[in-house]
């Protein structure tokens, strides 16, 4: 018996080592692809890119820095109305990076990330800076601390299309992937789960991200993760590889908008599928799976950023780590404690500020920060009722517990990066999409467990 157990452990160890090596290889390949995309973008003729940026200028000037999405926005209260605010500020910065190259060395430009400026600072006015990028005489500053992968994609697209045409392509891809995800979820899990997926997106005003690729790129990555998972009925090992790809790609394309959803949304769908099909059998399996995927995503996300810093330092022969340290400390910092008593109060204020943006002012009757509390209260009542009637299977209790643990991911993100998420709450609040989704799914599962006659034709059917 001991011999067989030893053999089984030895086999599992070899499989684990093999998977780790596979993940590392895929990560290295991804970094190479990221570099090649950036170099290719820098090689493209600037005349073509510049012409299409110039042709798009009227649209940029008309829209302004912070236009409002018309479906849910009002003008009564900026802080509440920020629910429908479109981030053209960042969009213009990205396009500026796309339109600016020195023309000297594409490899150097790909790491240096030159940016056109009228006052030697990209914070001044992105609209004026972008206009300067279309002219011959302007200041050049650099931002080697980020990948700016979306800017590289923009440069490739601007060599063919104007911004309006790029937006049409982007919206088509975004909504097509959303529809495909809904269909896959409905076919492989349940139509009700598919509806909760859509409702969670709508609560956080998914429509806004359709107007701004820099806000929507994390959604495209998340949808791609869901579709990749369902394409072959992935198991533990395959899904961990997906998480590595998700984490690295997020670090490459996203500029701290809602990165955590590329982990949380695909993992939420995965544990539902694996729980339903008996791949994950108990709470230990669920927790191990959550920890393993979180590590895979986090290491890939952090590793991709670290590789950019190392490559920039080597290729540019410069010490960029001072810049990196300043930018990272700004995101992690407790500088906001000047207006708060301590870091804990700062964290609570950050969480509350993001939660308060969940619903538009027109629909916010009870205070949107209480929406999650209301869902939790109903969930607790249902769980209590299930225990009293002893009608809920242990497997569903384990799954509900795993979803509740997973729902905390954006809260952890807000606490760690409070320096960033407190200031930029008007778009970072969309990280709560995963939390809303997990809690609503928990509510659905517990409700079906409470009413036995519905359980058989519900989640377990």
Describe each region flagged by the PLM.
Residues 11-21, 230-239, 272-288, 387-394, ...:
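Membrane-interface junctions at the ends of membrane-embedded or membrane-associated helices
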Residues 145, 149-171:
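Juxtamembrane segments of multi-pass membrane glycosylation machinery
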Residues 171-193:
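Transmembrane-helix motifs of polytopic, lipid-linked glycan transferases
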Residues 287-378:
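Membrane-lumen/periplasm interface segments of specific transmembrane helices
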């Amino acid at each position: 018996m001991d011999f067989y157990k030893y053999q089984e452990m030895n086999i599992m160890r070899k499989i684990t080592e093999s998977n780790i090596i596979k993940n590392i290889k895929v990560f290295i390949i991804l970094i190479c692809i990221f570099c090649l995309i950036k170099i290719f973008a820098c090689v493209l003729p600037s005349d073509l890119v510049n012409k299409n940026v110039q042709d798009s200028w009227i649209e940029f000037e008309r829209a302004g820095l912070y236009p409002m999405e018309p479906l849910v926005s009002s003008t009564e209260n900026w802080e509440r109305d920020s629910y429908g605010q479109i981030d053209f500020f960042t969009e213009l910065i990205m396009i500026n990076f796309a339109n600016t190259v020195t023309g000297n060395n594409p490899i150097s430009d790909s790491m240096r990330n030159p940016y056109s400026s009228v006052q030697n600072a990209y914070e001044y006015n992105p609209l004026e800076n972008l206009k300067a990028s279309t002219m011959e005489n302007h200041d050049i500053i650099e931002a080697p601390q980020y990948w700016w992968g979306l800017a590289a994609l923009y440069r490739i697209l601007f060599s063919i299309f104007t911004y309006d045409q790029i937006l049409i392509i982007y919206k088509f891809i975004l909504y097509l992937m959303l529809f495909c995800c809904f269909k896959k979820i409905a076919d492989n899990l349940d139509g009700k789960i598919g509806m909760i997926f859509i409702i969670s997106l709508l609560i956080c005003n998914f429509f806004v991200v359709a107007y701004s690729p820099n806000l929507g790129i994390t959604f495209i990555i998340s949808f791609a993760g869901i579709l990749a998972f369902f394409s072959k009925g992935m198991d533990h090992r395959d899904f961990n590889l997906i998480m590595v790809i998700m984490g690295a790609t997020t670090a490459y394309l996203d500029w701290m908008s809602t990165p955590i959803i590329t982990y949380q949304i695909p993992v939420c769908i995965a544990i539902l599928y694996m729980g339903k099909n008996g791949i994950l059998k108990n709470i230990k399996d669920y927790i191990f799976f959550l920890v393993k995927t979180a590590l895979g995503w986090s290491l890939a996300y952090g590793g991709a950023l670290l590789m950019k810093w190392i490559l920039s330092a080597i290729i540019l022969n410069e010490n960029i780590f001072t810049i990196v340290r300043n930018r990272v400390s700004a995101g992690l910092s407790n500088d906001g404690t000047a207006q708060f008593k301590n870091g804990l109060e700062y964290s609570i204020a950050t969480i509350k500020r993001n939660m308060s943006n969940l619903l538009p002012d027109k629909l916010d009757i009870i205070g949107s920060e209480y929406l999650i509390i209301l869902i939790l209260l109903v969930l607790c009542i249902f769980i209590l009722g299930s225990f009293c009637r002893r009608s809920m299977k242990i497997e569903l209790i384990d799954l509900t517990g795993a979803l509740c643990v997973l729902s905390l991911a954006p809260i952890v993100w807000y606490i760690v990066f409070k320096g960033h998420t407190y200031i930029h709450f008007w778009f970072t609040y969309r990280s709560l999409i995963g939390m809303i989704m997990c809690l609503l799914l928990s509510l659905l599962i517990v409700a079906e467990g409470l009413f036995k006659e519905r359980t058989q034709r519900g989640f377990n059917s």
